């Protein structure tokens, strides 16, 4: 498919989370600037006849080239992936022949904690749009209505995940005060039964950037924070998350605070302190914890940018020990992925045999299919 901007007839697209760019667009329009002149805002995409407005752009393969050659498409995607960091990204240009170019400006900078708090302090109705009333609402809302977002972004960097394109690899967090304020608001909802279903984000237990360098120089372009092993500069610390969960447990009207999914098991294994694992098992699991090892073949995991199967096994041993110490019998339910590029029949059989030996039938398996992010 062509760019959404080319097909939709829109003048401008705001991509990513959009809070910074949408305000800058509004200010530009309010000042009387014609929309075709708004070509300078990070986190936006615009159309133009030539490259005169783009500052030192990287010219990607044309639309015609990527739509006719899958290897060229992959090359273009790789360039786009390397330009997802707001500190180091360059403008990207894709030619549409006689129709001109699509120019993507670098991503907007991450929000500060105060800005995150301001976003979540807006007067949301916490329900579906009225247009859905006639159809009985949106059933899926029940799953998330009493969940709390504590962070945004993820430095996990899994190769199959589109999160880097949407929220970036630099972690952004809300303050404890902001999250507690929302929890107190939840307790006043007539449908609230005392259970907070989730506290987290793309990765539940990330509460600070992976290292201080990210805040001023951006993320490393050609290496990951956790793969193939944790970076020496990685700050592994669950202290802030544990503190937040303790405060939430004390909110009047809250019976239980659950973490149902999103725990990054290799980050937990890398933490030298056992406190998070102990309190996770003791207070925050409703019978089972969903985790995402994705596969059991180390070769496939390497292609995915995920930790080795041995790391997952280490996590399971520590999880079982913590359950035994607290007198609980709780389960870790794995997410697996089929059809990933590089996964051979032999790898698939190995995964099937592993699942068979676990003695249960997975209810959820993600089947990989390649799509643009």
What annotation goes with each model-predicted range?
Residues 167-195:
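Conserved alpha-helical substructure of the radical SAM core
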Residues 185-333, 337-341:
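Conserved SAM/AdoMet-binding glycine-rich loop
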Residues 116-117, 123-128, 138-139, 149-153, ...:
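Structured mid-domain segments that build the active-site/substrate or prosthetic-cofactor binding neighborhood
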Residues 135-162, 195, 369:
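N-terminal pre-triad scaffold of radical SAM enzymes
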Residues 11, 119, 154, 179, ...:
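Conserved, mostly hydrophobic/aromatic
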Residues 72-147:
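N-terminal [4Fe-4S]-dependent radical SAM core
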Residues 1-97, 104-105:
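Glycine-rich beta-alpha loop elements in corrinoid/cobalamin-binding modules
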Residues 275-276, 340-356:
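Catalytic cores of alpha/beta
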């Amino acid at each position: 498919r062509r760019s959404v901007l080319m097909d939709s007839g829109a003048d401008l697209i705001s991509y990513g989370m959009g809070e910074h760019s949408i305000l800058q667009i509004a200010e530009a329009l309010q000042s009387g600037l014609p929309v075709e002149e708004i070509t300078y805002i990070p986190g936006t995409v615009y159309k133009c006849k030539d490259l005169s407005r783009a500052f030192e752009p990287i010219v990607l393969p044309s639309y015609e080239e990527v739509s006719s050659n899958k290897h060229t498409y992959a090359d273009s995607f790789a360039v786009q992936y390397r330009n997802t960091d707001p500190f180091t990204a360059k403008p990207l240009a894709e030619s549409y022949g006689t129709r001109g170019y699509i120019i993507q400006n670098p991503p907007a900078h991450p929000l500060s904690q105060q800005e995150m708090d301001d976003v979540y302090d807006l007067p949301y109705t916490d329900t579906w749009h009225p247009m859905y009333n006639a159809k009985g609402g949106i059933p899926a809302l029940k799953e998330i209505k009493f969940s709390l977002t504590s962070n945004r972004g993820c430095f996990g960097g899994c190769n199959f995940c589109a999160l880097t394109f949407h929220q970036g690899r630099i972690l952004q967090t809300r303050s404890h005060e902001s999250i507690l304020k929302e929890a107190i608001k939840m307790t006043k909802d007539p449908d609230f039964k005392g259970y907070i279903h989730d506290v987290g984000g793309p990765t539940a237990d990330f509460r600070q950037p992976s290292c201080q360098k990210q805040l001023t120089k951006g993320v490393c372009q050609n290496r990951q924070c956790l793969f193939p092993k944790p970076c020496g500069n990685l700050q592994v610390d669950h202290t802030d998350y544990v503190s937040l969960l303790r405060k939430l447990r004390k909110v009047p009207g809250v019976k239980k605070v659950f973490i149902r999914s999103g725990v990054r098991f290799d980050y937990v294994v890398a933490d030298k302190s056992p406190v998070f694992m102990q309190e996770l098992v003791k207070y925050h699991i409703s019978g089972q914890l969903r985790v995402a090892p994705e596969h059991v073949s180390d070769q496939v995991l390497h292609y995915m940018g995920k930790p080795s199967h041995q790391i997952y096994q280490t996590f399971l041993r520590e999880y079982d020990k913590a359950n035994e110490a607290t007198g609980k019998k709780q389960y870790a339910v794995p997410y697996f992925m089929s059809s990933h590029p590089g996964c051979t029949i032999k790898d698939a059989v190995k995964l099937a045999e592993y699942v068979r030996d676990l003695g249960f039938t997975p209810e959820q398996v993600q089947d990989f299919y390649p799509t643009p992010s």
